[in-house]
Structure formats: structure tokens, C-alpha cells
Amino acid sequence: MDRTNQRPTRQKLTSGDIQGLAKDVLNVARGNLNPETSTRIESASDWLERYCLSNKYDASTAVDTLISRGVHANAIVDYCIPRIARIYGQEWSNDSLSFATVSVGCAHLQLVLKHIIHQRGFNVLGGEGKCILLAAPAPEQHTLGALVLADQLRRLDFSVKMCLGRPAEDVTKTVFENKFDAVLFSASSLETVKISAQCVNLIRQDYADQPVFFLGGSFLSSGGHEGMTHDFDHMTNKLDVIVNSIESATVMLSEVNRS
């Protein structure tokens, strides 16, 4: 399998290790922190929110400043970036910020994320973690959440390949040419959901090794997706649900293969 964009090999983690780490990530993302840490991260988020809209913006300066204030890089990814992206979206909906301004802010958040990933110093190596495809088929343009999820999954020892903003044909081709334990689709619109569902149905018809299919993204927050339950195995934005579902599916497959 093509190991591009994967997390490097480190000490092999058990399912229990992975689920425990997922809970740690969620504690940060949900703000389940002690008051001192929570206040520090909230303050850092407020600063980063303003700085990403500044004409003096620099990704390296942003990360260095936050770390100097005692905010761990993982907390920036798991809490600060998603929180600020939501705020930008709300302010655009309220006409407090223009679409152009929000686009600039989100692009700067993405550069912060890329800088942190680069600082981790991970080499592109074949890992032993379960393999996941993270897809956002064209014309999907909202990919920041998918990039955050990819980083979180890699820290949990998953191997992640991304197919973002690419035609549906590229997504299905990638699945057919590789072997994934799960395929996660990210969608912000009904159009992307329908395209993702078409990909799932095509893969189910023509592919022997069936991965677990997920639908996530901001579309789930808008409602109106109840009738699509038959197209995907799971519809969720919760990291622990994703991790537990993949682990459970792998255990079930192993038991079937042994029988």
C-alpha cells in the first residue's frame, strides 16, 4: 500500500492504549481541563483568533508565542484551531466578518497546523497502525476540520492518507488501489454528502475488502441527514466513536477470519 502521508512507526499501541489516548485528546477538545490550564488555553485562543486576521501574521511566530505562554502544540491543534474556526463561521453567519476575511483567517489557521506538524519531525515511514482514508470529494472546500482529524488520528498510531478536494473518481480509485480499514468522508454541504454516498455505494459494489465508512463534517450539525443512515456505517464527528468503531470492526474481522 502507498504509505504517503502516514505517521511514522513508533512503539506498537494496543487497542486500550489507543482508546485511552483518544480520551486524552477529547479532554482537551472539550475543555475538560483544570481551571488554570483551561484559562491559559482560552486566553491563547483569543489571541490567536485576532492574530490570524492581522496583517503581521506569521505561522512560526504564532506557534512560538502560544508555546511560550505554556500552551502545548497538541492543545493548539485539538482545541484552539477548531474553536477559532467555529467562531469565524459564526461571525460570518452573523455578518460580523466578510467571507474573504474568514477565508484568510482559516487559511492562517491551516498554516499554523502545518507548522506544528512540520515541527513534530515525523518522517514519512510505513507504520503498523490501521490504515484510514480521509476524503473530502470536490467541490468540498472546507478541509481544516479534516486536517485536524488527520493529525489526531496519526497521534493515535493510525496511518492516514488524505484525498481532499479531489474528484469522486480519484477517491474510489484510491480505495481500489489500496487496502483501508476505514474511509472517513468530510462534508459541509448536502452536495458533498450525496457525492460521498455515491462513492460508498460504488466501493461496496465493486470492492472485495470492505472498509468501515464514516460521514463527518459540519453538515452533521445542520440536521437533515437522518435519511442517509443506510449509506454510511457511522455518522459522527466524535473521535472516540471513530476510534472505537474501527477497533471493533477490526476485532470482528479477525474473529471471522479465524473461524
List the model feature ranges, each with a label.
Residues 1-121:
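Long amphipathic alpha-helical segments
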Residues 71, 157-159, 208:
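Short phosphate-binding/catalytic loops that engage adenosine nucleotides
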Residues 95, 148, 164-166:
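Short glycine/proline-centered loop/turn elements that form peptide/ligand docking sites
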Residues 125-132:
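A short, charged/proline- and glycine-enriched loop
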Residues 137-142:
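Short coil/turn segments
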Residues 147-160:
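Short helix-loop-beta junction
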Residues 163, 167-224:
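Cofactor-cradling patches in redox/metallo enzymes
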Residues 218-259:
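Peripheral docking tails and interdomain loops at the edges
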